Amino acid sequence: MSKCYITGKTTLFGNRRSHAMNATKRIWKANLQNVKIVDENGKVQKVKISARALKKLKLQRA
């Protein structure tokens, strides 16, 4: 399963509820973006990062 490299966000499972409160299964997928970053060793690494983490954190991008 896809997972955010920083926050660990993954897919969430739950129910869709109609007006009559009938439940059907649905999923929420994290908004993951492929990003190249420079790690602490100076190596370029391709990782998946959630859009929120990308917005909040100042990463050194390659």
From Swiss-Prot:
Keyword vocabulary terms for this entry: Ribonucleoprotein, Ribosomal protein
TM segment ranges: none
GO BP annotations listed: translation
Coiled-coil portions: none
GO MF annotation list: structural constituent of ribosome
Pfam families for the chain: Ribosomal_L28 (PF00830)
Example of a GO cellular component annotation carried by this entry: ribonucleoprotein complex
Family affiliation: Belongs to the bacterial ribosomal protein bL28 family.
PANTHER family assigned to the protein according to its UniProt record, in alphabetical order: 50S RIBOSOMAL PROTEIN L28, LARGE RIBOSOMAL SUBUNIT PROTEIN BL28A
Protein name from the UniProt record: Large ribosomal subunit protein bL28
Organism expressing this protein natively: Onion yellows phytoplasma (strain OY-M)
